[in-house]
Amino acid sequence: MNSQELKNRQEKIRNFSIIAHIDHGKSTLADRILEKTETVSSREMQAQLLDSMDLERERGITIKLNAIELNYTAKDGETYILHLIDTPGHVDFTYEVSRSLAACEGAVLVVDAAQGIEAQTLANVYLALDNDLEILPVINKIDLPAADPERVRQEIEDVIGLDASEAVLASAKAGIGIEEILEQIVEKVPAPSGDVDAPLQALIFDSVYDAYRGVILQVRIINGVVKPGDKIQMMSNGKSFDVTEVGIFTPKAVGRDFLATGDVGYIAASIKTVADTRVGDTVTLANNPASEPLDGYKQMNPMVFAGLYPIESNKYNDLREALEKLQLNDASLQFEPETSQALGFGFRCGFLGLLHMDVIQERLEREFNIDLIMTAPSVVYHINTTDGEMLAVSNPSEFPDPTKVDSIEEPYVKAQIMVPQEFVGAVMELAQRKRGDFVTMDYIDDNRVNVIYQIPLAEIVFDFFDKLKSSTRGYASFDYEISEYRKSQLVKMDILLNGDKVDALSFIVHREFAYERGKLIVEKLKKIIPRQQFEVPIQAAIGQKIVARSDIKALRKNVLAKCYGGDVSRKRKLLEKQKAGKKRMKAIGSVEVPQEAFLSVLSMDEDTKK
C-alpha cells in the first residue's frame, strides 16, 4: 500500500477500551461486540472470551489487558477497523488500565443500571480524562428488575460531569444496544493521529513469552510502518532485532504484511532474553530511528511486599525464571533475592496490592508448578535513625536495633468508600478501628454516600477489603491511592519458638495493639504447630521484652505402663530418666513450622479489638 492508501485506512481506525467497575458487565459487553462484528464464529464463542487465563475465568475477573481487531460495517456503508483493548476493573490492576488507555483514543464507560457509579468507576474515568480520551457512557444491565437508568444517567452527569443525554441504554447479556454502541464509537471516537511517513514509533503496552518465538511484543503504532524483515531497535537500551512476523489478534494471532500508524498488534523478532524488553518502551527502526522515545508509562511503585520461598529448595532457579517471565507480562511486579533462616532461599517481591499478590502466587503455582510458602505482607516504612539517616525498609527482619531508631513513618492512603447510607455507621466504625482519620463525606444522591478516610496502608493490607464487604453486605465499593507518610508509634514484634527467633514470622505493629496482637498470634501458633517430644515455649517479644507466652506441652510415652504396683521410687526413677532425655532433646531439638503458621500471622482473626 502506498502512503496515501495507508492514510485513508488510518481515517477508518478507531481504538477504544471499555472501562467499568468490577462486575458491571465489561467482559460480557466485549463478548457481544465480538459476536456482533462476527470476529469470532459462534462455534468458538464462549463467555468471557477475552479472559484467556484459567484464573481469570474462574474468579470472573479480568487481570490482563487484551487487544483485539474487529471489522465493523457502519450504517454509512463504510467498513471501519476497530481495536478493542479490554481492561481490568480491579483497583490492584490500575496499572494495566492506564497502559491500555494510553493506546486508545476513546473509552466506553460501562455503568450498571442498578448499582450506579462505584468508586472504581470514578478512578478509571479520571485515568481516561488524564489521557484526553473521548468517553462514551453506556448504561448496562437495563433488563434487571432493579434497574433505574434515569437515576444512573443523572448520577453520571452529577458525579462525573459527563453529558449522559446520549448515553446508550444496553444489556450486554441480552444483546440490546450493541449496535448503538458501535455506531457511537465510529462517530465520536477520533481516528488515530500520527504520520505514516514519519520514522517508526511503537509503544509496547504488553509482552508475552513464547517458548518457540521468544518474546512477543504487543504494540500500538503511533507513527510509521513496520513489516517483517525490518530491523527494529529498542529506544531504552539500543538493542536491535530482526522482525520475523507482525500481526493482529482476533483473539487468535493472525499474521499480516505490515502494521501501520494507528494499528494495535504484535511484533515477533526472536527476542531471546526477557530483560531486553520493557513495557512502556518505544520500538523504532534501526536504520531510520525516531529522534525521541514516546512518553511511555509512569513507573508503578509496589505497595505491598512479601517473601516467596519454594517449598522444595532445589526449585529456587525455577522460581527465578518463572518470576522473570511473569514480570515480562506484568510490568508492575518487582523482586529481589533474599534468604531466611527459617525458609532458606527465596525472593522478596513487590506487588500493587493484595489481589495482585494472590494472583501472582496462583499463577506461579499453576503455570510453573512451583509450590510456595509466602510470608506475611508488609509495606515500606521510613525509619529515621538516631544518626540522622532515613532508611526505607519493607522487610521486618531488616529493621534496625530499636535503640538506634529515632522515629518510624508509615504510608497512609486516601481511601474513598462509596456505600449506601444505612451502612455508613459500620464503615466508619471499621475505618476507626483500622486507625483511620475521617476526612470528609459527600452525599451522591438520596441513598449513597462517598466517605473519605486517611488510613495506614498496613491496615488495609491485612483484611480491610473483606471486612468492608462483610460489614456492608457487599454493597460498599472501595478505591485508594497513596497520599503521604506519617510518623507512627510502631514496633517490631518477634516470635520465638523454643527461644529462637523465627525471622519469617516477625511483623510490624502499632504499639497500642502490640500486646493483643502478640497474645493472639501466640495462641494461634499453639493450635497450629504440632506437639513435639519436648515442651516448646512460644513467645512474642518486642526487643528484649516478652509480651505474651504460651507453651506447647510435650508428647510423652507412658513409661509407667510396665509397672504394676511396686515401689513408688521405681516409678520416680523412670520418670526422672524420661525427663532428662526430654531436656537433652529440647537443647538440641528444632521445631518444624508448618505453612499454616505463616498464614495465620496473615489472617489475624479479630476477636480482639484489633
From Swiss-Prot:
Single biological process term from Gene Ontology: positive regulation of translation
Binding site for GTP: D23, H24, G25, K26, S27, T28, N140, K141, I142, D143
Membrane topology: Peripheral membrane protein
EC nos: 3.6.5.n1
Subcellular location field: Cell membrane
Keyword Secreted attached: no
CDD domains reported for this sequence: EF4_II, EF4_III, LepA, lepA_C
Gene3D superfamilies in alphabetical order: 3.30.70.240, Elongation factor 4, C-terminal domain, Elongation Factor G (Translational Gtpase), domain 3, P-loop containing nucleotide triphosphate hydrolases, Translation factors
Keyword Nucleotide-binding on entry: yes
Major site of localization recorded for this protein: membrane
Keywords attached to this entry: Cell membrane, GTP-binding, Hydrolase, Membrane, Nucleotide-binding, Protein biosynthesis
Entry's Gene Ontology cellular component terms: plasma membrane
SMART domains recorded: EFG_C (SM00838)
Pfam families per the UniProt record, alphabetical: EFG_C, GTP_EFTU, GTP_EFTU_D2, LepA_C
Listed InterPro entries: EF-4, EFG_III/V, EFG_V-like, EFTu-like_2, G_TR_CS, LepA_C_sf, LepA_CTD, LepA_IV
UniProt GO molecular function: GTP binding; GTPase activity; ribosome binding; translation elongation factor activity
tr-type G domain boundaries: 11-193
Catalysis performed (reactions): GTP + H2O = GDP + phosphate + H(+)
Matching NCBIfam families: lepA, small_GTP
Membership in a protein family: Belongs to the TRAFAC class translation factor GTPase superfamily. Classic translation factor GTPase family. LepA subfamily.
Classification via PANTHER family: TRANSLATION FACTOR GUF1 HOMOLOG, CHLOROPLASTIC, TRANSLATION FACTOR GUF1-RELATED
Function: Required for accurate and efficient protein synthesis under certain stress conditions. May act as a fidelity factor of the translation reaction, by catalyzing a one-codon backward translocation of tRNAs on improperly translocated ribosomes. Back-translocation proceeds from a post-translocation (POST) complex to a pre-translocation (PRE) complex, thus giving elongation factor G a second chance to translocate the tRNAs correctly. Binds to ribosomes in a GTP-dependent manner.
Protein name, as recorded: Elongation factor 4
Organism: Streptococcus uberis (strain ATCC BAA-854 / 0140J)
Taxonomic classification: Bacteria, Bacillati, Bacillota, Bacilli, Lactobacillales
